Amino acid sequence: MASFHVIEHVDSPRSFVCAAAERLKPGGLLVIETPNIDSLPFKLLKSRWRQFIPEHYFFFNPETITQLLAQHGLKIDSIRTIGKYASVDLIMNRLGRYVSWLPNVNGFSQLTFRVNPLDIMLVFATKSS
């Protein structure tokens, strides 16, 4: 079962995880992707962090998501951070919000790079037997 950017939007993460755990068979896998409130981008940017939006009712870090899942019989297999591909144009646009002296990147704007700001967790958990 997979949940990508859902748990931070629900009224009750406990109920959400409970419902997921009830539907999993023993040994079944739950995958959750959610912002990581312990990330460096949050620590540096605080309320300007791109994931700090009103639609996110709850935030988690590796410890709190581990505790929540354990309360419902789920054991963490791994927690990873994920990245994405971003164009030079997007990167410069995002950085330009905080740094006004960035150079012009004409001709390079469509180049893409893999970036990982370490602020999104991908959690793999298994239901206990």
Short names for language-model regions:
Residues 45-53, 92-99:
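Short glycine/proline- and charge-enriched loop/turn segments
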